[in-house]
């Protein structure tokens, strides 16, 4: 209700520099809400003074004669304040004025002086001055930081404690003026603290902080799920209100406590569900990597059905784990920063791979009697030195080794390179051992643990028998190529920008002479950049049938019709179209449909024939378009190659703009009226033809009857 705005400058005794707000927005709002103050000097004041946040408001009794007593704001001497602008509402008996120009600032607040004088007499009484005091509660701005802890079932928000009295053990927080607000706008869920506690919320206050626990399934929290990945967003406001002050703790958070993690021999893949936020950067260790530098730093992304981040295993750490017999890859304190609803929001997770096994026992041995496997240098930390790889106690070497990517591939015989054989149940198991040294051992002392060892295994089913045979196959059949379904559409647009076509329910459209009609033919459901849409002919008819007569040519053989005085103009699709070759845009002037200076009186229907061409190798003579048409003869079109499309509805042409001046040409009233006239004229013609036919038949019957009478006589 404030009409004037008052700004307060606040500085701390310590002379601290300007505070800055972090991702947590904290606002401390002070107000004195409808507090009726005692009148220290004259208890007979005929009204109630209210000290609001930005102004002073005096509400007089309805029995008070405002015009007679004329209340006014004055200084301590009773003189009117020159620059004070106050509002006096005679109907509602209310006087309002701002603090800045109508009060006197004193220690701790503002002095208010009101004079009430009888305007019907010149006699002044000494008790017509009233003095009041409005307290000023200063606002404080604090440099603060929030702590958000995300779990799958709970979010914990911690805010700094501002007033020690809130931590008073004698205070019953459930009865204080606390309100919890989850969400934003009209969909926000607002709860008094007492109701919130019943629904699983919890508020903890100590001398250092205020902590609110919010259940993850609370109304107002938005959840996003994809496969086994979970992410949710929450916008929180925690409000504390008491006499004369209002504190608002505000936070906006993204939580991803349970993202899907999958690991293979080369990468860790992190799956983030699709939601309106955009991932801007990732932080781990000492690195903060923006999106445009991910690939260069070993992070690749897949943005289909959500977002998948692939971290090279060389970026990961390893640790011993009680649940893993060997070691485990992980990323510590991975910080994901998103741009979401105008804010930069971060969440921290600790993704881990499943246990790494040094033994591979589930692979079938190759049919040629060999065992195939791969070794990566980053399978351990420190990395392996691939030049020191050995197979068992032999000198067998990998068949393929690339140091740049840290890969070595082996193809070792089952009867060589130290491969051992044993029987387990119905399986014949072959195993060998790979060992290598680390590139940078942790110390200069060499222990057995300084050498990397990995057991590799494969198996055959015990009753399997190896057979060698040569099978001669038939030659592969030749591919049969047949064009797929071709789907085209013809549309009209309001202007040359080609932003939004007219809908089907907007037809028939109304156009005047000299107005261009912007049309577009495009290919639907095709994303092949090698195909191109080529126009053959475009024409207009007075009925829906494309083959009806008369016909007015617009485009012939892919070019403007040369016999038109006002020729068709083609427009390029431009960079806004995903595949510009899938579009043909042009406009036609309505002069093309005027004969002997008279406009058409019926609806006009437009049609086009077109075909799809292969830009790599032109597969039809119709694909070769050379304009103008006078440079070549009329092309012979194969009807099987082309497809004819029509506008969704007709266009109504008006020959004279002045005849409908001041009327919207797209008005449905004009359209209905002219269509009605067109239908009426056609109906009248049909009735006239029917009457004429009846007269002729009657005349023939009359002649036949007369002839019969003469013949009988």
UniProtKB/Swiss-Prot annotation:
<dbReference type="GO" id="GO:0005783">
    <property type="term" value="C:endoplasmic reticulum"/>
</dbReference>
<dbReference type="GO" id="GO:0062023">
    <property type="term" value="C:collagen-containing extracellular matrix"/>
</dbReference>
<dbReference type="GO" id="GO:0035805">
    <property type="term" value="C:egg coat"/>
</dbReference>
<feature type="transmembrane region" description="Helical">
    <location>
        <begin position="684"/>
        <end position="703"/>
    </location>
</feature>
<feature type="disulfide bond">
    <location>
        <begin position="365"/>
        <end position="458"/>
    </location>
</feature>
<keyword id="KW-1133">Transmembrane helix</keyword>
<dbReference type="GO" id="GO:0005576">
    <property type="term" value="C:extracellular region"/>
</dbReference>
<feature type="disulfide bond">
    <location>
        <begin position="396"/>
        <end position="417"/>
    </location>
</feature>
<keyword id="KW-0165">Cleavage on pair of basic residues</keyword>
<dbReference type="InterPro" id="IPR001507">
    <property type="entry name" value="ZP_dom"/>
</dbReference>
<dbReference type="GO" id="GO:0005771">
    <property type="term" value="C:multivesicular body"/>
</dbReference>
<comment type="similarity">
    <text>Belongs to the ZP domain family. ZPA subfamily.</text>
</comment>
<feature type="glycosylation site" description="N-linked (GlcNAc...) asparagine">
    <location>
        <position position="184"/>
    </location>
</feature>
<feature type="propeptide" description="Removed in mature form">
    <location>
        <begin position="634"/>
        <end position="713"/>
    </location>
</feature>
<dbReference type="InterPro" id="IPR051148">
    <property type="entry name" value="Zona_Pellucida_Domain_gp"/>
</dbReference>
<dbReference type="Pfam" id="PF23740">
    <property type="entry name" value="Ig_ZP2_3rd"/>
</dbReference>
<dbReference type="GO" id="GO:0042802">
    <property type="term" value="F:identical protein binding"/>
</dbReference>
<feature type="domain" description="ZP">
    <location>
        <begin position="364"/>
        <end position="630"/>
    </location>
</feature>
<comment type="subunit">
    <text>Can form homopolymers that assemble into long fibers (in vitro). Polymers of ZP2 and ZP3 organized into long filaments cross-linked by ZP1 homodimers. Interacts with ZP3.</text>
</comment>
<feature type="glycosylation site" description="N-linked (GlcNAc...) asparagine">
    <location>
        <position position="83"/>
    </location>
</feature>
<dbReference type="GO" id="GO:0035804">
    <property type="term" value="F:structural constituent of egg coat"/>
</dbReference>
<keyword id="KW-0964">Secreted</keyword>
<feature type="glycosylation site" description="N-linked (GlcNAc...) asparagine">
    <location>
        <position position="264"/>
    </location>
</feature>
<keyword id="KW-0272">Extracellular matrix</keyword>
<keyword id="KW-0732">Signal</keyword>
<keyword id="KW-0472">Membrane</keyword>
<dbReference type="Pfam" id="PF23736">
    <property type="entry name" value="Ig_ZP2"/>
</dbReference>
<keyword id="KW-0278">Fertilization</keyword>
<keyword id="KW-1003">Cell membrane</keyword>
<dbReference type="InterPro" id="IPR017977">
    <property type="entry name" value="ZP_dom_CS"/>
</dbReference>
<feature type="signal peptide">
    <location>
        <begin position="1"/>
        <end position="34"/>
    </location>
</feature>
<feature type="disulfide bond">
    <location>
        <begin position="613"/>
        <end position="623"/>
    </location>
</feature>
<feature type="topological domain" description="Extracellular">
    <location>
        <begin position="35"/>
        <end position="683"/>
    </location>
</feature>
<feature type="site" description="Cleavage; by ASTL">
    <location>
        <begin position="167"/>
        <end position="168"/>
    </location>
</feature>
<feature type="disulfide bond">
    <location>
        <begin position="84"/>
        <end position="102"/>
    </location>
</feature>
<dbReference type="InterPro" id="IPR048290">
    <property type="entry name" value="ZP_chr"/>
</dbReference>
<keyword id="KW-0675">Receptor</keyword>
<feature type="glycosylation site" description="N-linked (GlcNAc...) asparagine">
    <location>
        <position position="217"/>
    </location>
</feature>
<feature type="glycosylation site" description="N-linked (GlcNAc...) asparagine">
    <location>
        <position position="393"/>
    </location>
</feature>
<protein>
    <recommendedName>
        <fullName>Zona pellucida sperm-binding protein 2</fullName>
    </recommendedName>
</protein>
<dbReference type="InterPro" id="IPR055355">
    <property type="entry name" value="ZP-C"/>
</dbReference>
<feature type="glycosylation site" description="N-linked (GlcNAc...) asparagine">
    <location>
        <position position="172"/>
    </location>
</feature>
